[in-house]
Amino acid sequence: MPPAPTPVETEFVISDDGNSAKPWQWFKYLAQSQSGYLLIETDAGIVTINPHAARERITYERLLDSASARESLSTSQTLLIPETVKLSPIDFARIQAALETVRRMGFQIEEFGQDTFKIDAIPQQIATLPVAKVLSTIAHDLGESGSRRNGERWRDELVAKSIAKSFAGASLALTEAGAVQLVEELCACRMPYVCPRGKPVMIFTSTRELDRKFARG
């Protein structure tokens, strides 16, 4: 059996920039469980974090911020080799109808033949995800939404949520430094407690609750 990981002893103090919900004043990263959950110690007790849900929340807010500020080009990552993605006729039509919204998220994308798009750049936040899967997810969610609502802000939120959702089943291997960075980025979110789909990002276990369960005090 491999030795247990050594906790990162540094305590990370969370700065107050006025934008974050500040779930805690400081944290100490402890470990990542075999099932992938992150464990940290805070001033409130022990916190268990779902890193996939955390990445969804971070990505969602950053995409919306970029779209609102019209800074999509500055937050895009240019592909070394442009990628072509062929979709079903229905999915192609859905992306085509929402092309400006997709571009606001950071995609440099254009039509490239029958039912095909050419992608020259993608949002920095999704550099590790397969582009075809992300576009298919966006198309699916656009189809599910139908025309029940309209408006630029609503479309931005829908597409950003679809892109972020692509992390749900993705591999997310984290080093200790990567885990700490993820927690720091989560702390800067406006709504760090739930992912865009409403699922919990973290579970708190207070020191008082731990003492009660262990019949201490």
Language-model segments: residues:
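Long, charged low-complexity intrinsically disordered regions
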Residues: P3-G217
